Amino acid sequence: MKIFSGLLPLTALVLCGCATQAPNASIAIQDNETLLAPGVACAMPPPTGSNVNAAQTIVAHFRGQTYSFEAQIQETPDEFDLVALDNLGRRAMSVKWRGGHMDYSRADWLPVGVRPADMLGDIAIVFWPTDTVRTALAACGATLIETSNGRVVKVHNRNVIDVAYEHGEGWNRAAHLRNPAFGFSIDIQSAEIAQ
């Protein structure tokens, strides 16, 4: 297994974790569900069925603070692996997702509310094929709209996640994810690594 380094996953994880420390108490969130907004949980989309090895640099903004991370992602048709490091090179989290089951290890210094499913959900919303994401979101009452330069996730006609893309395609581009429901944003620089 290759060692991974990139920022999107860990930053999303930390930011979603900060946001999910006080979720709507009326819903129970499963380990394989991602929290899009307070009270809105969706099952994780399945792996895309493709082979991807990508490195990401992530800068996240939450409540006046800035966080930076690195992550490396490896996906095969049946599995998704991620390793996230903080800017000191410390391993923050390792995630293995196979057959709808997620195994992970996390550093003790991560906030308690940091959830790998939220991190993977943000990765899917930004980088996975439109139809895969749209189908997963529809199952929980959310919709995905593609714009000329990004994506918008809506729940009850309210924007809960906005994604804007810069140059490039697929895993080889910069993206900016904003989640006004939880008050965070993530700037991602992603590059696919030749296999």
Model-derived features: positions:
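Structural recognition of beta-strand segments within beta-rich domains
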Residues: 62-89
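Sec-dependent bacterial lipoprotein signal peptides
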Residues: 1-18
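Acidic/charged, solvent-exposed loop-and-adjacent secondary-structure segments enriched in E/D, K/R, S/T
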Residues: 103-131
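A mature extracytoplasmic/lumenal domain signature
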Residues: 84-88, 97-101, 106-109, 190-192
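Bacterial Sec signal peptide processing site at the extreme N-terminus
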Residues: 15-34
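Hydrophobic/aromatic beta-strand elements that line small-molecule binding cavities or substrate pockets
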Residues: 70-74, 93-95, 162-165, 188-190
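A short, Trp-centered hydrophobic/proline-enriched beta-strand micro-motif
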Residues: 44-62
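Gly/Pro-enriched, hydrophobic low-complexity segments
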Residues: 140-195
